[in-house]
């Protein structure tokens, strides 16, 4: 899984480890990733293999899949957790930040799925009663426009569409994909909005973690393309 050193990704890694999964975790910052791996290993008692990778470098993304395949030879769950976002009005968004968000949030996810699909299909064929899953951390901004998040929302819409394509092409083979699309979750990535939304009013990391775990327990006969999670209140379509 990518984006495993912090926030929702780290929470999902911890929960899957406790559920008995052997983990290959990835993040860009090696020191933070190693700390996460040591913590996860202590908590879960299972195998945790850290692979530092820059999601903007295709060779790193490909190397991550190869490293997992060489170590385990199977892939039950691929979690697309790496992501980056910037808040800015559409007219003031730089091309550099546009490119970075699409490189990390969309291109890297596409390459990961493309590289991992043969292994996912192989795993699903070996255990047809369970199949294999792709879980993508998307956003409600991929479904409903949010001011100042035009590019971020566009990348998440692409991620949602990627999951739908996986289902259209691979669900008959036992491989299904689910995009989890929450509003603001109480993590360090949402610190910039806490002057408007109190953390106590945000979605909890554990809420998303439990949804991800539930998806892993579904049979291949149940395909869930996306899950939308909103905060309480009257404007349920807003992040």
Where are the regions a protein language model picked out?
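Conserved glycine-rich Rossmann-like NAD(P)H-binding loop of the short-chain dehydrogenase/reductase
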Residues: 19-36
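Residue(s) in the substrate-gating loop at a strand-loop-helix junction
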Residues: 139
């Amino acid at each position: 899984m990518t984006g495993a050193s912090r926030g929702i990704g780290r929470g999902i890694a911890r929960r899957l480890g406790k559920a008995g999964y052997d983990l290959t975790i990835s993040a860009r910052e090696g020191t933070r990733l190693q700390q996460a791996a040591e913590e996860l290993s202590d908590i879960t008692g299972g195998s945790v293999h850290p692979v530092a990778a820059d999601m903007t470098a295709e060779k790193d993304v490909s190397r991550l899949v190869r490293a997992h395949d060489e170590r385990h030879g199977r892939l039950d769950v691929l979690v697309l957790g790496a992501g980056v976002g910037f808040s800015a009005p559409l007219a003031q968004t730089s091309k550099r930040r546009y490119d970075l968000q699409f490189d990390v949030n969309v291109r890297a996810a596409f390459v990961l799925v493309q590289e991992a699909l043969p292994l996912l299909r192989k795993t699903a064929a070996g255990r047809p009663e369970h199949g294999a899953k792709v879980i993508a951390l998307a956003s409600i901004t991929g479904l409903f426009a949010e001011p100042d998040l035009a590019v971020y929302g566009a990348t998440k819409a692409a991620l949602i569409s990627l999951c739908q394509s996986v289902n259209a092409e691979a669900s008959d083979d036992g491989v299904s994909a689910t995009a989890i699309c929450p509003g603001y979750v109480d993590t360090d990535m949402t610190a910039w909005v806490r002057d408007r939304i109190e953390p106590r009013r945000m979605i909890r990391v554990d809420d998303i973690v439990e949804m991800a775990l539930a998806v892993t327990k579904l049979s291949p006969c149940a395909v869930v393309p996306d899950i939308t999670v909103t905060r309480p209140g009257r404007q349920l379509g807003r992040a």
